[in-house]
Amino acid sequence: MYIFETKLWPVGTNIACLILGLVLPKLGNSIEDICDTTNWESSQRKLERGKFITDNTIIRVSFAYLYRIKSGNKYLLVKNERGTGKYQPVGGVYQFDEDERSNLQRLFQIIDDNKMPIDESSRNDYRLRMGNKYLRKFIKYFDKQKKRENIEDLSREFREELIEKGIINWEKISYRYCGRHITDLQFGEHFQTYEILLADIVELLPTESQRNDLKSLEDKSSDQYRFATAEEISSFGVNTALGQFKDEIANHTVKILEENQCKLSKEMNDSKVYTVKI
């Protein structure tokens, strides 16, 4: 009997190890899947499991805020200044304080984005690169960080794109937070690199006087701006019926549409109204 049990013991152990070897990885994957609470986290995990990316793969990040500005059923868009010539929402990439650069380099080993020209006005943009292993902590850090542009004052891009160009002449604005659009982690065909794009959407809450100003702008013709319907934005300005085949509206503009509100996540209070001086 003793000999019989001794001979069977290694066989039982091997079978148990084989079963555990098959079950534990799947159990581990299931636990990881439960911990991934957002689509972008799930997309990152799939790329890692498929060996498409590793901890050291360089990821490009671009974090911005965009204004939803409506006049009637049309949205106010401004011309892009970086050479595309396309119309897009008022807004741009978040910026961090000068002192914050050293913290980002120390914590996440950030690298400047090499896909866009860098000058004094864009040196501290949240348009960066870093190793994939830092991405999750970086996004959590971004939401907690105060040494950057925050929801309490998003006047800079509004001022630069509308006030300083003489398009409108307002002393202050009010807006509310609508939500956040964040892409999956994916390979971007345009820049040929893995990237993740984040955009916080805010809606302008114009006064009656400001609504009148917007209506006056809509009645004028200008190369600096245009008003577009949701349908025009969704087709990027292309209208085959009228023979307009050039895509004059940037593809990220669809993020501000009211029709796409359901696609935004709520990262903060969306009922609070913020008022800032321009």
Predicted segments, located by residue:
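N-terminal leader/linker segments that precede catalytic domains of diphosphate-processing enzymes
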Residues: 1-278
